[in-house]
Structures are given as structure tokens and as C-alpha cells.
């Protein structure tokens, strides 16, 4: 099997086991120790991580070790086949996790209404957050980590929510990292961002360092700029796919390399069978005769007494059935390591119901893995949300706090939509806050926006008060035996109903 440790600009000295955390015992970074911490401790670790990240990214793009495959015998027949399953699994999970945009909804403990949250969601949508989330998920799945940076937009004109005072970006993880304190809590103490000036020489990058209150620029090993900033927190947040910062297909790389080698050898076997070696027995053939065979496809031989002349071929055909059995076994290992569902084969053409298909084809394992990724994403997204809200409070007068917002990542669009509609219809009729009916079933991609759009109808039906809030239990309109709101009946209707009841 080809060695996969070699990468552009360096070597991976160990098997890939996730990215290394960058930690320091320092509790803060300032002008006095910024060079010592960043250049002396953080950059060497980041260089190792960067080599691995670039290898994984190139692997995802199709630059895989089988392309450097060589053969000692029959070197003229050397096929190099890349079955890019790394691209397959990353593309699948990217769509599965970010196909429906991340949404913000009002939390149960929020004191205000959800209108301001809806304005925030719309404003971020105008800023392209959905596309940035997709890019962020791709980096997380490729190399186990991604970054989101949020800074005040210097071009903001005060027209929130038509425009936002937020400058949101997703830098490449090989050009950014977070420095953590190595003590209890592993608190982040600094952000480092590389600004490339010469893509052929990483050593010429401008290094930007953010602390909660200061900003530094390091150029050629010297601090060339130092100033304070008013944000009061770190602007960049690290998103980890898992605690080890290991990419989705990273554990399966040996299996993926073996699949590429097997497929390449299978094609070599077919080519060698077709282009088999000719053996001439009891006859002499010169180069001109061989050229004539290639041109005409036939030749004439003469036999002598006791020495019959013959021509045969040395051809050993590869057993394709055994090769396919081995390939299927390795594909099953790949699917197990990446929790990929089975989407091919005749086994899918059955009359099973949705639940049976989900379990049989591995979608339950996919959903369990996705739930782990979602929990890690929400943890980091809440930190990014705190930075966004801090900037909005300082520039746009927003009163939102991070505790007022719940983060939703809608998924499982293969579920039965009719069941979701039935759950929604049942919940909306119960004496509960109507917003729970919008957020619980997973029917709406943006539950908060759907709830805000439905408010006039909920008010008209008595589910919400005139102020747009759920009435208190004692204020809930009473229902008669037929389920009709008695509070909505006129005096005459109420009197007629009472007389009819007395007559009965």
C-alpha cells in the first residue's frame, strides 16, 4: 500500500489521530509574552496541524496515495483508480447537517417576544450565514475542526435589520487557530489568524493575534502593531467535530487506500489478460514477423517431423468474484467507520415501512452520529452567538441575550411529513404555549419565523392574547362540550344555548 504520510511542505510523522490542541500555562497574552507564546509554542504545533489539514483536504479533493502507485513487473500496465469515498461521505454529511439552515428560536426562559430573534435570523440570512455554515461544516468534516470569526463591520450605517453591524467569515483551519489555557476549564485566551502574502512561502504570512481586549500584528518575528479593541471577548470560535478534532473519513483512510489499490489491481488484471504474453513453441519468429502479427492479426507456422510448432498465451485471469467479495467487505468497514447509510443494492426494493428501512439501511446509526456532531456544533455556535449579540447591543441597541435563544438544526427530511403535521395539529389544540407546537415536531425549517407569521391567526383563534403572548391559565377561554370557545359567543348565543340546555 502506498505511503500516505507525505504531504506538501512537510511529513506526517505519525498516523493521523486528530489535530493537536494548542495550549499554554499562561493565563493571558499581552505585549510582554505574545512573541514567546505565539512564535515559541503555538506556531510549531500549528505547523504540524497545518500539514495534516492540507493532506486531508487534498485527500478529499481526490489527490490520494494511489496516484503515486508503482509496479515492479508489467510497469507499462499500471492503472491508478481513485474511488473518492472521502468526498462521498463529506458531501453527504455536509448536506445532511447544513442542508436545512441553522435557525434561532425563543428559549423557554426568554422574557421578550420572538420578533427580535426573527429579525436577527433574517439579518444573518442576508449576510450569507447559510452559505458560511455549509463551508464551516465541510471543514469540520474534512479535518475535524473549523472556525468562525465575527467582527464589527466598519461600513455599518445604522440600518439594522436591513443591514447588520456584523462581519462574519469562516477562515480556513490551516490559517487559523485558538490558543487555550492548559488549566482547569481550558479557557481560550487568544485567536491567531494568518494573512497570506505569498502562497508559495507560508513563513511570510502576517500573523494577527486577538486577545479579549488587545490586537497584535507579528511580521517576520516582530510585533509591528499593538492596539486595544472594545469587543471585550475573543472574536473567533473553534468548532470541533469531536473532542479529538478528527475528521469524518480520517479513521477510514487505510481502508480507503486499500479499496483504491484493489480496484487498480482489478483493472490491471483485466488489461494484462487482454494483453497477455505470446509463447512460440518450436518456431523462430523475428521482429518483422511480430509486427506482421500486430498488423494482420494472424501468422503462418511450419512444423517439422516430431517438432510441432504452436503459439499460445500466458494468461491468468483474476478471480473477479473473490475480488468483489473483498471489496464489499471493505466497503462495509468504511460505512461502519463513517456511519454512512446504505443507499445502493437490491435490498432497498422492498415493501417495508419507513421505520424498517431506516433501521435496515443504517440511517439510525447516521442519525446517532449526527446527533453527536450537532451537540458539538451547538456548543461552539452559542459562543459565536454571544459575540454577535455583544456587537448588536453595542451598535444597534439590541437587548437580546444568548440565554434568550435556542439553536435548532432541522434534519431528517426523510421522515413522514404527515406524522409531523398530525403532531403539530394535536399540540396546537392543547392548553400549552403555541410556540411549542411550532418548535417540537420539526415540521418547519425556521420555527420562529413560522410562529411569527402565524401570530395574527393565533390571536384571531384565541390561542394568543391581543399582545401576541400566550394568556395565563386563568385567562384561557373556556370551551363548551363541543369544543367551541364560550368566550367568543355573543350574549344572545349564550342565552339560547342555556335555554336549550334547560329544555333538555
Where are these regions (language model features)?
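Extended, helix-rich architectural segments
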Residues: 1-167, 496-504
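Extended hydrophobic-aromatic, low-complexity segments
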Residues: 49, 323-324, 343-346, 418-419, ...
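Intrinsically disordered or highly flexible coil/loop and linker segments, enriched in small
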Residues: 261, 265-279, 336-347, 379-401, ...
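Surface-exposed loop-to-helix/strand elements on domain peripheries
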Residues: 109-114, 303-419
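Extended, regular secondary-structure scaffolds
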Residues: 134-245
Amino acid at each position: 500500500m502506498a505511503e500516505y504520510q507525505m504531504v506538501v511542505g512537510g511529513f506526517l510523522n505519525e498516523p493521523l489521530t486528530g489535530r493537536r490542541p494548542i495550549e499554554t500555562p499562561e493565563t493571558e497574552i499581552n505585549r510582554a509574552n505574545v512573541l514567546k507564546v505565539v512564535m515559541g509554542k503555538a506556531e510549531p504545533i500549528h505547523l504540524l496541524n497545518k500539514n495534516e489539514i492540507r493532506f486531508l483536504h487534498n485527500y478529499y479533493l481526490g489527490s490520494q496515495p494511489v496516484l503515486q502507485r508503482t509496479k515492479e513487473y508489467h510497469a507499462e500496465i499500471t492503472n491508478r483508480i481513485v474511488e473518492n469515498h472521502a468526498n462521498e461521505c463529506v458531501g453527504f454529511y455536509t448536506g445532511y447537517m447544513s442542508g436545512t439552515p441553522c435557525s434561532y428560536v425563543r428559549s423557554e426562559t426568554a422574557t421578550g417576544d420572538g420578533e427580535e430573534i426573527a429579525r436577527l435570523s433574517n439579518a444573518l440570512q442576508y449576510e450569507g450565514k447559510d452559505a458560511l455554515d455549509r463551508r464551516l461544516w465541510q471543514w469540520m468534516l474534512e479535518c475535524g475542526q473549523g472556525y468562525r470569526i465575527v467582527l464589527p463591520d466598519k461600513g455599518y450605517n445604522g440600518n439594522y435589520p436591513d443591514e447588520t453591524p456584523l462581519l462574519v467569515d469562516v477562515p480556513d483551519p490551516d490559517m487559523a487557530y485558538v490558543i487555550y489555557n492548559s488549566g482547569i476549564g481550558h479557557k481560550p485566551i487568544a485567536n491567531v489568524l494568518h494573512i497570506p502574502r505569498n502562497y508559495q512561502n507560508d513563513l511570510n504570512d502576517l500573523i494577527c493575534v486577538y486577545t479579549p481586549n488587545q490586537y497584535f500584528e507579528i511580521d517576520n518575528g516582530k510585533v509591528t502593531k499593538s492596539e486595544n479593541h472594545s469587543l471585550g471577548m475573543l472574536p473567533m470560535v473553534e468548532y470541533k467535530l469531536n473532542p479529538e478534532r478528527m475528521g469524518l473519513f480520517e479513521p477510514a483512510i487505510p481502508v480507503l487506500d486499500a479499496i483504491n489499490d484493489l480496484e487498480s489491481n482489478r483493472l490491471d488484471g483485466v488489461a494484462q489478460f487482454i494483453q497477455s504474453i505470446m509463447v512460440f513453441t518450436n518456431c523462430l519468429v523475428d521482429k518483422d514477423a511480430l509486427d506482421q502479427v500486430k498488423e494482420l492479426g494472424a501468422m503462418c507456422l511450419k512444423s517439422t517431423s516430431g517438432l510441432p510448432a504452436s503459439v499460445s498465451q500466458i494468461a491468468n485471469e483474476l478471480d473477479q468474484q473473490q475480488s468483489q467479495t473483498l471489496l464489499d467487505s471493505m466497503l462495509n468497514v468504511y460505512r461502519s467507520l463513517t456511519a454512512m447509510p446504505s443507499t445502493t443494492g437490491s435490498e432497498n426494493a422492498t415493501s417495508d415501512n419507513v421505520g424498517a428501512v431506516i433501521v435496515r439501511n443504517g440511517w439510525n446509526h447516521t442519525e446517532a452520529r449526527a446527533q453527536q456532531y450537532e451537540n458539538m456544533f451547538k456548543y461552539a455556535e452559542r459562543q459565536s452567538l454571544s459575540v454577535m449579540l455583544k456587537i448588536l447591543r453595542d451598535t444597534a441597541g439590541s437587548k437580546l441575550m444568548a440565554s434568550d435563544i435556542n439553536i435548532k438544526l432541522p434534519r431528517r427530511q426523510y421522515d413522514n411529513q404527515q406524522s409531523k403535521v398530525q403532531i403539530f395539529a394535536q399540540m396546537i389544540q392543547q392548553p400549552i404555549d403555541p410556540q411549542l407546537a411550532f418548535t417540537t415536531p420539526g415540521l418547519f425549517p425556521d420555527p420562529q419565523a413560522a410562529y411569527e407569521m402565524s401570530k395574527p391567526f393565533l390571536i384571531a383563534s384565541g390561542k394568543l392574547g391581543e399582545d401576541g403572548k400566550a394568556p395565563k391559565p386563568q385567562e384561557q377561554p373556556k370551551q363548551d362540550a363541543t369544543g367551541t370557545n364560550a368566550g367568543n359567543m355573543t350574549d344572545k348565543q349564550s342565552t339560547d344555548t342555556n335555554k336549550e340546555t334547560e329544555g333538555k
